């Protein structure tokens, strides 16, 4: 079985500079952007999306969202920017994140999660 190292998405930590440094130390590592809300992707000029994957080939983006339509629109935008994976955050236990009904709060709504 192939071993892989994944660097979890961490707000304020896994920015493009950190990921670049890690990629110099470990060639076969999975890297992720910090979590970004799907609405921010849909309602922005995509600066975050462009900036966070400017020079890296193997980067996943982690999004948070609870509206299936918004998540699909965000995923469509992301596909245009050379990310190799879209990761839906359903595990963040932060109260701030849960207050937005995303992250681990989605686990309390399994039927909604199916639609996303």
In which residue ranges do the predicted regions lie?
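Glycine-rich, positively charged N-terminal anion/phosphate-binding segment
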Residues: 10-81
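Extreme N-terminal starter segment of soluble prokaryotic enzymes
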Residues: 1-5
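Feature marks short, surface-exposed loop/turn motifs that line or immediately flank catalytic pockets
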Residues: 39, 92-96
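Non-cysteine beta-strand/loop elements that form the S-adenosyl-L-methionine
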Residues: 33, 85-93
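Conserved small/polar residues in nucleotide/adenosyl-binding loops
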Residues: 114-116
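Glycine-centered flexibility sites
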Residues: 12, 65, 89-91, 101-103
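Glycine-rich tight-turn/loop motif centered on a GG-T
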Residues: 96-112
């Amino acid at each position: 079985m192939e071993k892989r190292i994944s660097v979890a998405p961490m707000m304020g930590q896994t920015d493009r500079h950190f990921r670049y440094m890690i990629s110099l130390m470990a060639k076969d590592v999975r890297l992720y952007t910090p979590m970004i809300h799907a609405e921010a992707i849909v309602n922005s000029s995509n600066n975050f999306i462009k900036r966070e994957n400017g020079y890296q080939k193997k980067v996943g983006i982690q999004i948070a969202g609870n509206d299936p339509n918004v998540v699909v629109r965000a995923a469509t935008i992301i596909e245009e920017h050379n990310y190799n994976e879209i990761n839906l955050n359903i595990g963040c236990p932060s109260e701030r994140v849960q207050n937005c009904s995303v992250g681990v709060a989605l686990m309390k709504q399994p039927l909604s999660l199916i639609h996303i």
